[in-house]
Amino acid sequence: MKYYFFFLIILSLKLTAQNFENSIKKTDKLVEKFQNKNKIPGIAVSISYKDKLIYSKGFGVSNLETKEPIDPSKTKFRIASMTKSITALTIGKLMEMDSIDINKSVYTYLKKLPKKKYDFTVKDVGGHLAGIIRVPTGERYDCKNTYSQADFYNSFENDDLLFEPKKQLSYSNYGYKLLGLIIEQQCGDNITNCHRRLILDKLNLDNITPDSKNNESLNNNFYIEEKGQNVLAPCLDCTFKHAQGCYISTSEDIIKLANGIIYKDRLLKEETIKELIKTQETLEGKKTGYGFGFSSKRDFYGNYYFGHNGGYQGTTTEYRIYPKESLVITVLTNKSGDFRLDDLLNEIGFQFIEQIK
């Protein structure tokens, strides 16, 4: 009997893939064209529909020297600021545990945090509305960095806010460091363990792990372009950066994470998810297109989605959740540059959504 049910599952997956045969062929061409135009060594693309993986392919290589092919189930990429969604989900879990109220002042949780001219809430910080500058003065991302958690309170005291909270959106990794400190205090552990225990382990996401400067065992390299050639990205220091970024993942584990968000009670309650993905507004009532750890907007074709992108030296990434269509798209690359990954996701999304309609 168990073989019969296994056969039905395989048959169902094959039928689903066949339903999207045209979209799959067009996606192959779109990705290949994008990869060739931008000289990207490796890309992983994974797509699910109604919680089923209908497309998962690797293009190119993870290492230009060894020619190791991209495997969407195994090849890990830097996901950069996509990590902010994991931090937001962790805060969402702490909200459900009555450990955090995002509408309260950050000073409620960090009593020793130096006072600024204006007060601001946890939600303001999560939506990049608090006026905090992008990165702390003195922090570097290369391996000459000496800035650490021990420096946070001193730098926060000396770094001025850019504007009155909620006046406008200003993207801030610095703010997510602050959120990480709140999580650590309310969770009672370091940020990566809190991510793991409250979110990642709930979905058995073993391939989403903290990044470090010692990833040689992965047989992965990350690239930038210099004088028209792909060269190795500089060493990345991840000290005190795991609330804002500095994770690696396979594209398929990002799909699992995304489906854990949209299907009820796998991770968080429906009302918690709605609170996190709802676009925030400025003092003047202008929608920012960003919730709490999630972009929340419409694509080029007018289809609503939420998700996050990520970019740093050696990576350009994005995932999108189209809730109305039950469609999830993840694209991870091992190169940074000025190419527009948004455009590729717009076109991939369009191909599948047109067939779903």
Question: What are these regions, as identified by a protein language model?
Answer:
Residues N22, K26-K33, G42, S81, ...:
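Extracytoplasmic/secreted proteins, especially bacterial periplasmic and envelope-associated proteins
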Residues F59, K117-G311:
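Short, surface-exposed loop or secondary-structure junction motifs
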Residues D299, K335-K357:
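Short, gly/Ser/Thr-rich active-site loops of penicillin-recognizing serine hydrolases
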Residues M1-N22:
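Bacterial Sec-dependent N-terminal signal peptides
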Residues K52-L53, S99, Q229, L327:
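Residue-level signal for well-ordered, solvent-exposed loop/turn and beta-edge residues enriched
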Residues F34-A44, T66-D124, F163-Y174, H242-G245, ...:
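Short active-site loop at a secondary-structure junction
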